[in-house]
Swiss-Prot record:
Localization per record: Secreted
Keyword ATP-binding assigned: no
Protein name (database record): Hylin-b2
Presence of the UniProt keyword Zinc-finger in the record: no
Length: 19
């Protein structure tokens, strides 16, 4: 479960920072 949600959070946070 967590293994599938971590990538999603990392993608969202990374997108905001890399914005």
């Amino acid at each position: 479960f967590i293994g599938a949600i971590l990538p999603a959070i990392a993608g969202l946070v990374g997108g905001l920072i890399n914005r």
